[in-house]
From Swiss-Prot:
It comes from Bacillus subtilis (strain 168). InterPro entries: YphA_Bacsu. It comes from the Bacteria. Keywords: Cell membrane, Membrane, Transmembrane, Transmembrane helix. This is Uncharacterized protein YphA. The chain crosses the membrane at residues 1-21, 28-48, 51-71, 83-103, 127-147, 154-174.
Length: 199
């Protein structure tokens, strides 16, 4: 079942946003985005490439949200281009010499991009935008390069959707872990201050 990881990951994210997060307008927007993305995942749009509609939704919403967050500075553009190059490199290297890969190339690309994103950006929303845009544009670059060898191919199919949704959950987990670690660190500092005052 090719779309297994995508559907389970998106349903997991939908349950988180709908039942666990605080009731805000942003929560409603994210829930609607997830459900719409799941619905669109079975449709393809024929342009220069055959584009999956859910992939296109990720790309367009990522660009819009990047503009909303003001991510048009040189630093973000360089990080974004690095992520695109990393994604395309992993896939092209896997075609050239697949022996080096212990795991599937899509998972290697996701792990690499998640690590790069988490190491250069601390804000979770900006991490998410950088990750999604890097994955989207990287897939487009890879498809453009490989079409000369393999002919026309679908961009953003379920293989890509699986990897992208799993990467978003991984980023969410890293964000929550960092938040928890900072809270524990603050509590330990307070308890140490209290102990020194008592002594």
């Amino acid at each position: 079942m090719e779309q297994f990881y995508y559907y389970w990951s998106m349903w997991f994210l939908w349950v988180l946003t709908t039942f666990i997060f605080e009731k805000t307008k942003r929560r409603i927007a994210v829930s609607v985005f997830i459900l719409t993305n799941i619905i669109l995942s079975i449709h393809d749009i024929a342009l220069y490439f055959s584009l999956n509609a859910a992939y296109l939704m990720f790309f367009v919403c990522g660009c819009v949200y990047a503009g909303y967050l003001g991510m048009y500075r040189f630093r973000y553009i360089m990080v974004y281009l690095t992520l695109v190059a990393a994604y395309a490199f992993v896939y092209l290297f896997a075609l050239y010499d697949p022996v080096w890969f212990i795991i599937k190339p899509e998972w290697a690309a996701v792990i690499l991009i998640v690590l790069l994103t988490a190491s250069v950006e601390r804000n979770f929303e900006k991490q998410l935008v950088l990750f999604v845009l890097g994955m989207c544009q990287g897939e487009l670059v890879y498809s453009f390069v490989i079409q000369k060898l393999a002919g026309a191919m679908a961009v953003g199919g379920f293989q890509w959707l699986n990897a992208c949704s799993a990467g978003m959950i991984l980023l969410f987990g890293i964000s929550k872990y960092e938040h928890l670690a900072s809270q524990i660190g603050q509590k330990s500092k307070r308890s140490n201050k209290g102990a020194t005052k008592m002594s």
